[in-house]
Amino acid sequence: MAAEKTIQYPIFTVRWLSVHALAVPTVFFLGAISAMQFIQR
C-alpha cells in the first residue's frame, strides 16, 4: 500500500496475525466437523 515501512509495519503484522488467527482455526474446525460427520455416518 504505502511505501513508508516505519510505522505501518507493526500494523501490517498485527492485521496479518489477526486474520490468520481467525482464518486458520475456522478452516481447521470446519474440516474436523465435516470429517466427524462423515465418520459417524
Curated annotation (Swiss-Prot):
It comes from the Eukaryota. One of its GO terms (cellular component) is photosystem II reaction center. The chain crosses the membrane at residues 16-32. With its partner (PsbE) binds heme. PSII binds additional chlorophylls, carotenoids and specific lipids. Keywords: Chloroplast, Electron transport, Heme, Iron, Membrane, Metal-binding, Photosynthesis, Photosystem II, Plastid, Thylakoid, Transmembrane, Transmembrane helix, Transport. GO terms for molecular function: electron transfer activity; heme binding; iron ion binding. Its cofactor is heme b. Its main location: plastid. InterPro entries: PSII_cyt_b559_bsu, PSII_cyt_b559_CS, PSII_cyt_b559_N. One of its GO terms (biological process) is photosynthetic electron transport chain. Heme binds at residue 20. It is found in: Plastid, Chloroplast thylakoid membrane. It is a single-pass membrane protein. Belongs to the PsbE/PsbF family. This b-type cytochrome is tightly associated with the reaction center of photosystem II (PSII). PSII is a light-driven water:plastoquinone oxidoreductase that uses light energy to abstract electrons from H(2)O, generating O(2) and a proton gradient subsequently used for ATP formation. It consists of a core antenna complex that captures photons, and an electron transfer chain that converts photonic excitation into a charge separation. Heterodimer of an alpha subunit and a beta subunit. PSII is composed of 1 copy each of membrane proteins PsbA, PsbB, PsbC, PsbD, PsbE, PsbF, PsbH, PsbI, PsbJ, PsbK, PsbL, PsbM, PsbT, PsbX, PsbY, PsbZ, Psb30/Ycf12, at least 3 peripheral proteins of the oxygen-evolving complex and a large number of cofactors. It forms dimeric complexes. HAMAP family: PSII_PsbF. NCBIfam families: cyt_b559_beta. This is Cytochrome b559 subunit beta. It comes from Mesostigma viride (Green alga).
